[in-house]
Amino acid sequence: MKVRASVKKMCPKCRVIRRHGKVMVICSNPKHKQRQG
C-alpha cells in the first residue's frame, strides 16, 4: 500500500474508488495499491 498525495491509475486494471472519505486505487497487481493521505 502506497500513501500518496496524488493517486493515479498505473495500469488499465487499476480502479479509483472512495472508501470512508479516502480516495484509493485497487488493482489486481498488489504493487499498484494506493491511498490518499
From Swiss-Prot:
Classification via PROSITE patterns:
RIBOSOMAL_L36 (PS00828)
Asked if the Swiss-Prot or TrEMBL record annotates the protein with the keyword NAD, the reply is no
According to its UniProt entry, one GO biological process term is: translation
Record InterPro entries: Ribosomal_bL36, Ribosomal_bL36_sp
Q: Which UniProt keywords apply?
A: Chloroplast, Plastid, Ribonucleoprotein, Ribosomal protein
Q: Which GO cellular component term is one of those annotated?
A: ribonucleoprotein complex
* Cellular localization per UniProt: Plastid, Chloroplast
The answer, when asked if Ribonucleoprotein is one of the entry's keywords, is yes
From which residue to which does the signal peptide run? Answer: none
Q: What is its main location?
A: plastid
| GO-annotated molecular function | structural constituent of ribosome
The UniProt similarity line reads: Belongs to the bacterial ribosomal protein bL36 family.
Protein name as annotated = Large ribosomal subunit protein bL36c
Tell me the organism.
Ostreococcus tauri
